[in-house]
Amino acid sequence: LYFHGLGEFFYLNGISVDENSFMYITTHGKKLNSTGKELNNHKVIVPVGGGKDSIVTLELLKEYEMDVIPFFVNPREASWRTIQVAGFTKDDCIVVERTIDRKLIDLNDKGYLNGHTPFSAMIAFTSATVAFLTGISNVALSNESSANESTVPGSKINHQYSKSFEFEQDFHEYSRKYLLQEMHYFSFLRPINELQIAKL
């Protein structure tokens, strides 16, 4: 996740690094099994960013008679307008507030390198936590097919790696193995492109 998610950051800053030596992650905690908690399969959490893709996902899932719950991290005014267009109110939503550690801001002020981080991966882990706490089994994203495409010609570097199908599959498997066995993390719009979404 970190290696591929920071691919564009490495490229723009001329940093040469390989996947095997980039980072070592160790833990000293006790191993825990994934929970067998039963989840509601008729409800779906939909992370909302504020664009047309989220509106389409919300509208289409309503047609399937799913209990749809919009989910926000630090919602903007555009985010609230999105759910209103889709026929939801603030009372229908789950909202998480996120703050950036002051130490990161201080490091930026001192001239340390700054760049894109895998924000959608943070959304993935946060929505999985919300799914567990609320007993909901489905998290439906609104990532479309172009999220898989490289943003640097002739490379596999993808500014949106954590929106890609590769990440989606990896996170789904990780969640079922270590977090929630019954959780389904998927992008509802993955098979279609932006033009097709605009038509919908």
Where are these regions (language model features)?
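Metallo-beta-lactamase
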Residues: 49
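Nucleotide-activated chemistry modules centered on ATP-dependent adenylation/adenylyltransferase
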Residues: 10-44, 52-200
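Phosphate-/polyanion-interacting regions in eukaryotic proteins
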Residues: 1-12
